[in-house]
């Protein structure tokens, strides 16, 4: 285990040396970081690049030789989902952070480009009840998404609207001009996006998420982008399967709230 190393961002010329450490992972957010589209790669300082972290928004993928300093490093997030490459990383996270890291399971969805039925997806969009309207996210809707905690993740990965306009894609459903559900690109990589789905609590289980997600998937297919899906819970798996995806496997993550530096000094 590597100890007592200064952590720094990976230099562009080092990415090719780091990429093999992530070779066994089919995670679009890792691809975003490696391609330099979004996110960052972090490494312990030194000439031997044997450990790395791919961090994008709330996700941090830890790979290579376990390094305690990469677990305790402040990635600048109030909430972080740490994804260990293997059991050695998982053991290190538990050893270093203890009960400050909540053990959770997430659900990987297969990446199958030909799994979608465009007619079925179009029907799901058109099934939207009359009191609702669906809109592509523009500047006004981008700003409205940021006004509420439940909808902020639809666009918060993009520091400004211009960034979202350049890289992002998304749709929201409104009622009387107010956003009640949405589907957007949580992140972007060269060949596609990672999907984010959010619905205001009192509007859930009304088919709104299916309509918004269908509109997003159809637009991705029209643009030649792959709409990747990763599920937080089994309800998200069920929605994905309704839209044509297939479940792949469960995987372990650790949810860490608040600043890591503060956490580690708290009794």
Question: What kind of feature is each model-predicted range?
Answer:
Residues 38-144, 255:
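Acyl-donor-binding surface of acyltransferase catalytic domains
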């Amino acid at each position: 285990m590597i100890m007592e190393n200064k952590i720094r961002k990976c230099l562009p010329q080092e990415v090719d040396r780091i990429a093999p450490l992530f070779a066994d992972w089919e995670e679009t957010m890792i691809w975003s970081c490696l391609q330099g589209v979004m996110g960052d790669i972090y490494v312990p300082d030194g000439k031997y690049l044997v450990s790395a972290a791919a961090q994008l928004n709330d996700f941090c993928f830890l790979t290579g030789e376990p390094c305690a300093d990469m677990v305790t490093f402040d990635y600048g997030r109030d909430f972080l989902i740490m994804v260990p490459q293997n059991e050695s990383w998982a053991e290190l996270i538990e050893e270093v952070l203890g009960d400050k890291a909540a053990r959770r399971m997430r659900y990987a969805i297969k990446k199958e480009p030909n799994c979608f039925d465009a007619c079925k997806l179009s029907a799901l969009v058109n099934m939207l009840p009359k009191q609702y309207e669906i809109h592509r996210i523009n500047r006004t809707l981008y700003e409205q998404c940021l006004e509420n905690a439940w909808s902020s993740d639809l666009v918060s990965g993009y520091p400004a609207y211009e960034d979202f306009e350049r890289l992002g894609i998304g749709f929201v459903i409104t009622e009387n001009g107010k956003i009640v559900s949405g589907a957007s690109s949580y992140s972007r990589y060269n060949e596609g996006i990672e999907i984010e789905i959010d619905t205001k609590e009192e509007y859930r289980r009304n088919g709104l998420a299916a309509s918004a997600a269908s509109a997003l998937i159809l637009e991705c297919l029209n643009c030649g982008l792959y709409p990747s899906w990763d599920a937080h819970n089994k309800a998200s798996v069920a929605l994905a399967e309704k839209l044509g995806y297939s479940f792949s496997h469960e995987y372990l993550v650790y949810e860490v709230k608040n600043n890591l530096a503060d956490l580690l000094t708290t009794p």
